[in-house]
Amino acid sequence: MSDNEVEMEDVVANAERSRGRGLAQSRNRERITYDVVDEESSATSGAPQRSVEGWIVFVTNIHEEATEDDVHDKFSEYGKIKNIHLNLDRRTGFLKGYALVEYETQKEANEAIDQSNDTDLLGQNVKVDWCFVKGKKTSGKR
C-alpha cells in the first residue's frame, strides 16, 4: 500500500458523525456579545417611543370613505404634520380603517392623542393612541 492510500477502517475510526445542525462555529454563539438598542427600565415600560423620524400616533376607526385631506384637517390643529400614511384595501379602494400620523415633537403628538381621542370624524368616533411604545422588560426565559 502506498502513502496516498488509506485503509477504510482508519477513515471510519477518525470520522465524526454530524447531526446536521449547522457548522461547529455556531456552537460559540453564547460567547458573542450583541449591541443593545435601548435599555428600558420598568418605570418607562409602556411609555411612548420615538420612531426614527418623529412621533407617530395610530388612529383607528376611520370611516372607509375618508380622504387624506379629511385626516390632515382633523389632526393639523394640534401641530405640524410631517407625514400621514393611509392604507387602502386593494380590492375595494377604500381605507382599511386606520391611519398613521407623524408629528415632529412629542408635545404635538400628546396633544393630538389627548384632544382627538373619541372625537367625531365623518360620523365615526376615532380612537387615537401611540403607534410605538416601549415594551415590558423580559427575563429572557420562556
Swiss-Prot record:
Keyword terms, alphabetized: Cytoplasm, mRNA processing, mRNA splicing, mRNA transport, Nucleus, RNA-binding, Transport
Record-level GO cellular component terms: cytoplasm; exon-exon junction complex; nuclear speck; nucleus
GO molecular-function term, one example from the UniProt record: U2 snRNA binding
Effect of disrupting the coding gene: RNAi-mediated knockdown results in embryonic lethality due to developmental arrest during morphogenesis. RNAi-mediated knockdown at the L1 larval stage results in increased sperm production and no oocyte production.
SMART domains from the UniProt entry: RRM
Tissues in which the UniProt entry reports expression: Expressed in somatic cells and germline cells.
UniProt GO BP: embryonic morphogenesis; feminization of hermaphroditic germ-line; mRNA processing; mRNA transport; nuclear mRNA surveillance; positive regulation of oogenesis; RNA splicing
Subcellular location: Cytoplasm; Nucleus; Nucleus speckle
The UniProt record lists the keyword Metal-binding: no
Span list, region Disordered: 1-26
InterPro entries tied to this protein: Nucleotide-bd_a/b_plait_sf, RBD_domain_sf, RNA-bd_8, RRM_dom, RRM_RBM8
Domain RRM intervals: 55-133
Acidic residues bias spans: 1-10
Assembly and binders: Heterodimer with mag-1/MAGOH. Part of the mRNA splicing-dependent exon junction complex (EJC) complex; the core complex contains CASC3, EIF4A3, mag-1/MAGOH and rnp-4/RBM8A. Interacts with rsr-1/SRm160.
Protein family: Belongs to the RBM8A family.
Protein's job: RNA-binding protein which binds to pre-mRNA, spliced mRNA and spliceosomal snRNAs. Preferentially binds to the spliceosomal snRNP U2. Core component of the splicing-dependent multiprotein exon junction complex (EJC) deposited at splice junctions on mRNAs. Positively regulates the nuclear export of spliced mRNAs including the sex determination gene tra-2. Promotes oogenesis by repressing germline masculinization and spermatogenesis. Required for embryonic development, possibly through positively regulating the expression of pie-1. Not required for the spatial patterning of pie-1 in embryos.
Protein name, as recorded: RNA-binding protein rnp-4
Organism: Caenorhabditis elegans
